[in-house]
Amino acid sequence: VCIVPMYNVRGALQRNGALRVNQNGPEAYGFRGNARNLDLNRDFMKMDSRNTRSLVAALTRWDPDIYMETHVSDGADHRYLMELLLTHRDKLDPTLRSFANDHLLPGLYTWMERKDIGMCPYFETVDGPPEHGLEGFVDGPRYSTGFSALQGRIGLLSESHMLKPYADRVNATFQLMLATLAVMDQHGEELRTSRMQAGSNTAAAEAFGLNWQIDTTRTELLPWKGYTASERPSAVSGLPQLHYDRSQRMDTLVPWRDHAIPTITLTKPVAYLVPQAWPEVIQRLRLAGVPLDTVNEERTERVEAQRITDFGTVREPYEGHYLHQGVSTTTDTIEVVLHPGDVLVPMGHRTDRLAMEMLEPRASDGFFAWGFFDSVLQQKEWFSDYVFESIAAELLAKDPELRKELNDRRSTDPAFAADAWQQLYWVYQRSPHYEPGHRLYPVMRVLR
């Protein structure tokens, strides 16, 4: 057993008793953000903090069979002392999913029930209080449990209920730790076998699903122990405010959606090519245990090159980044020159899924989404309209098909037809003068 008693060191030292307004004690506690105001349980893919880089390196080196992290919840009121978040089972390899369903979860819930500690799955409310419906949490790889799945292990996260007495929360967390150890002691061999098989399955897989979300078409019923909820006039605003009446217990069944599906599925390449110009990307791959081959001599490779055609960016910074989302790409097969010092990420390993989640530009928690490649999004060279006008006219005169495309665009887009500069830029983008590296994603997919 390896224990990290203080992960967020600077945050733990920022003692206070006021900043967790939803929380019932203790008298003093730490702060969520580290010295750079980063939430470390959003940092596992981007690894901005030294804290996370140290922990990921330790996980890679030690390779535990189960990872467990302890938290305090921040959400709805109910009668359960503990909420349990497990790496979403639909995202796990089938062998690990079976172990979780057959051994881990039954063992944990049975232990906690024997200790008279109420425990429920970690959830998100759908529309108001819990009785209106609950959804499971799809833990992307920015979170410790989602990242653990990509390293081929089950991740657990305890969320003791913030309004329960502090001593009870501590005991519940301790008992869940003991329960986990008991399951591992009893079923350790099955767990190790499951992990080995999961690694082999990942290495042999031809494709992986990415960007998972809750399947809203599948609903079950979950036994629920809560409190009657109602709306009362707010003493502050006078408007309706949610209120839980702890004098009125409620035992019922609530709608429960906890099946996840990927929104895209991508086939594996033979390898990824990461140019040496991106050392911060290579460093993170290495820390996560992804096998790398350094190119020793110049050679040519046939690759799939992706160009970013569209993306959205959040308006407010999140964990030190302006996240990209809704990424669209086009793909071309080209030949590129590999230089000594460039890095190949070969597939055929248990880390294949982790590498794909890091390196694919459409992956919602990948390096492109976190802004690691933002410099390729900026166009460096432009044109003066009075200079390019004659060049554009000559290009159109020599290429009837290009002129037809321009005329078609003008006939279907009135705003475009009324904008002389946009029409020149349209021609410029299709000319030899347009820089080939603009929006060209630097990481290539090797085909051989």
Q: What are the roles of these predicted feature ranges?
A:
Residues 1-448:
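Structured catalytic-domain cores with a bias toward divalent-metal coordination
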